[in-house]
Amino acid sequence: MEASFIRSLPSAGNFANLLPTGTALIFETLLPSFSNGGECNNKPVNKLLTITLISFCAAACFFSSFTDSYVGQDGRIYYGIATSNGLHILNDYPDEGYDPESGLTADKRERYKLSFVDFVHAFVSVIVFLALAVESSDFRRCLLPEDDENSWGGHFVLMIKYFAVMVLTMASFFFAIFPSKRRGIGISDIR
């Protein structure tokens, strides 16, 4: 039992890395203001702001699934975006005369190329974010119909809550079985 628990810890950490903490923090911080505390029944501006916030955060989750980093031969950490040709470096220092890609071997270059798994991870990351967003009471009160528990709206909200729990459980299994090889921007451990 102890060995299986120890083996599951890296998977739990990987799950936390796949949903960008900054994105979740921005969402939880701005949602009460944008949704007027969940009271946007007759205020289309608040609904629009809430939908815009959710869209922006979902796009950030999707985009962050394609970011990676590595340490160059000069000891600096380089951040980039995965492309079909490899990693496109974002923080290059051309004025110092060092080529950050010169330290990458052919097998490392291959590792940083965009793959189908990256798109699957990006899609699942967005689904996880949306499932967590639905769990917010401000989100539900602003955008989902909520009548008494015996009406269709009440059943719909209850179904959404259970659906979110199911999605999060399935995503945690998915991320444990198919861990991401991307480290993202801001992950401090060095390979």
UniProtKB/Swiss-Prot annotation:
Signal peptide: none
Superkingdom as given in the UniProt entry: Eukaryota
Record-level Gene Ontology MF annotations: kinase activity
Location, primary (coarse class): membrane
Native source species: Arabidopsis thaliana (Mouse-ear cress)
Protein's gene: DMP10
One Pfam assignment: DUF679
Tissue and organ expression note: Restricted to flowers.
Record localization: Membrane
Similarity-based family: Belongs to the plant DMP1 protein family.
BP terms from Gene Ontology: endomembrane system organization
Membrane topology recorded in Swiss-Prot or TrEMBL: Multi-pass membrane protein
Reported function: Involved in membrane remodeling.
Protein name per the record: Protein DMP10
Transmembrane regions listed in the UniProt entry: 15-35, 48-68, 114-134, 158-178
